[in-house]
């Protein structure tokens, strides 16, 4: 009987040890999960703030500047996007740009912010688009050990004459909507970042009053549906041709293209930033 009692006491003690260990393990796991939850909330909050700051750098929505009407949208695939666009008027000229950084998320967003600030810094002392893009490329090449790059379209429109000088660095050629739809002729310059001292060509076109410039990133043409088919340039042009026939204003053009993309992609996950900018020359 004494032996049995000892055995039972040992078993009971072992049970208490097991219960105590489980309680300790559960408590430690709960603390770890709480810490992870707190860290996740902090990261989410930081990303939200970064996204708000990023969007504040761009002229989202509808604007009218000296009779020039513009409308732009940016829908990032993640909290922070790698696309950029901007436009402003100074000394009778309309400066415009749109770009797409390779990659997504925070790294792409940081490069986008750097490129955005440098573009306008260079514009203070220079109006030639090719020279601005060349200077931007040389700056981007410094200490670029990761070989990060981005595409960019940069244009300067003389509001008095309608003459637009522009330089395209590997970006999707814009469209001109007037009495017909035309893809802007763009030389195949390389993107910004990989090669220092690269040459970028200057091009020129004269726009007629009432023309609309439609700029976009490849998040439009490469938008996938649930069957992994791309929206593509043909669908893009078909929608824009309809906009020409209906003589739509910048906001209506962007909204029409956006609706067409959403209808095409349905419930497919967005894989890339979607950015569009339409500017109507008075």
Language model features: what each stretch is:
Residues 1-30:
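Alpha-helical transmembrane signal-anchor helices
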Residues 5, 9-12, 203-215, 220-282:
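C-terminal catalytic subdomain
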Residues 24, 105-106, 110, 223-224:
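Charged alpha-helical signal-transmission linkers that cap and connect PAS-family sensory domains
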Residues 31-214, 263-282:
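… and, occasionally, acidic/histidine-rich disordered N-termini of signaling adaptors
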